[in-house]
């Protein structure tokens, strides 16, 4: 299994999963992207921009839901700094970087689904 690369593609994939789960906890809408959605000349910084931009809005929306949604959102929110490197990968991913990104994404999404069940999409 690919591991985190020096430029943070594995962590960027984990961050993408965390941002998607935060969005889902806030809205209960959509399906998580499949790993293949991140293949083919993608730039991690662009894949993460919308989720990072709406993170606080999603946190506030989830707060209004309260209960288990809020508890899950707090846990996910607390993990985000671990996935956020000093600089997001800003160039098109090569095949190894792509594999690391997808592996990080799939690993983290699976962990959230195991921990939060249907709340994680």
What are these regions (language model features)?
Residues 1-121:
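Intrinsic-disorder/low-complexity detector
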């Amino acid at each position: 299994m690919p591991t985190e690369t020096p430029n943070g593609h594995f962590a960027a994939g984990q961050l993408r999963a965390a941002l998607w789960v935060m969005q889902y906890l806030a809205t209960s809408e959509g399906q998580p992207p499949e790993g293949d959605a991140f293949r083919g000349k993608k730039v991690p910084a662009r894949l993460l921009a919308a989720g990072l931009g709406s993170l606080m809005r999603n946190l506030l929306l989830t707060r209004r839901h309260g209960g288990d949604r809020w508890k899950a959102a707090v846990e996910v929110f607390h993990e985000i700094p671990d996935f956020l490197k000093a600089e997001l990968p800003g160039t098109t991913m090569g095949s190894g970087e792509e594999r690391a990104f997808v592996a990080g994404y799939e690993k983290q999404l699976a962990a959230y689904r195991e921990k939060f069940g249907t709340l994680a999409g």
